[in-house]
């Protein structure tokens, strides 16, 4: 059985970068970056660009916006303002606010980040948050999440069933380039 692999910079509230660009983030990480896993034989693997992105729980699309590596899909799970954000993806062209999704339904593919100056590997960024009830979806974007003061962020790892997660010290670029 394989396992997810996380480096400290991939985790919620980390101030560190985990990609070759290195250094510190300007703000604490708002979620979890997912891209590395073991193949069950002990080999380390990473997502290929274009891998399908399924949703973790049923919900309704309330917003789709650009982010710095692709696009982000905001999914409301209940009418209490609990939202998951799937970022750095290429969403299906049919996704629009109001679109209802079932658990496991594919919403898009991980964006190809090759050629970016920061050399960041293709990955899925997952944010879990609560927003004020009744907030219009068109107000949701990364500027709102990071600067409005109206968002409560949650650690995605505490909300996921993840018995096969492994935390590794250091950064990915340290393991690839000793």
What annotation goes with each model-predicted range?
Residues 80-104:
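Short histidine-centered loop motifs in beta-beta connectors
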Residues 29-33, 77, 88, 123-125:
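Histidine-centered active-site/metal-ligand motif
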Residues 1-71, 103, 150-178:
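Surface-exposed, glycine-biased beta-strand/turn segments
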Residues 37-39, 78-80, 129-133:
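Solvent-exposed coil/turn segments that connect beta secondary-structure elements
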Residues 36, 63, 88-91, 112:
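A residue-level detector for short acidic-glycine micro-motifs
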Residues 33, 74, 85, 109:
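Conserved beta-strand positions that form and line the central face of beta-propeller blades
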Residues 75, 99-175:
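Conserved, short, structured surface segments that act as functional micro-motifs
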Residues 70, 84, 121-123:
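Short edge beta-strand segments in beta-sheet-rich domains
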């Amino acid at each position: 059985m394989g396992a997810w692999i996380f480096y400290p910079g991939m985790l919620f509230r980390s101030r560190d970068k985990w990609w070759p660009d290195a250094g510190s983030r300007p703000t604490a990480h708002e979620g979890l970056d997912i891209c590395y896993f073991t193949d069950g034989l002990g080999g380390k693997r990473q997502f290929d660009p274009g891998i399908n992105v399924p949703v973790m729980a049923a919900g309704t699309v309330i917003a789709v916006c650009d982010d710095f590596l692709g696009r982000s899909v905001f999914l409301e799970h209940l009418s209490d303002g609990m939202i998951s954000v799937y970022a750095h993806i290429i969403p299906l062209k049919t996704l629009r606010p109001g679109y209802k999704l079932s658990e496991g339904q594919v919403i898009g593919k991980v964006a190809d980040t090759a050629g970016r100056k920061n050399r960041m590997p293709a990955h899925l960024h997952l944010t879990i948050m609560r927003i004020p009830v009744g907030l219009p979806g068109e107000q949701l974007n990364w500027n709102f999440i990071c600067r409005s003061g109206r968002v409560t962020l949650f650690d995605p790892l505490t909300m996921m069933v993840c018995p096969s997660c492994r935390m590794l010290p250091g950064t990915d670029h340290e393991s690839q380039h000793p």
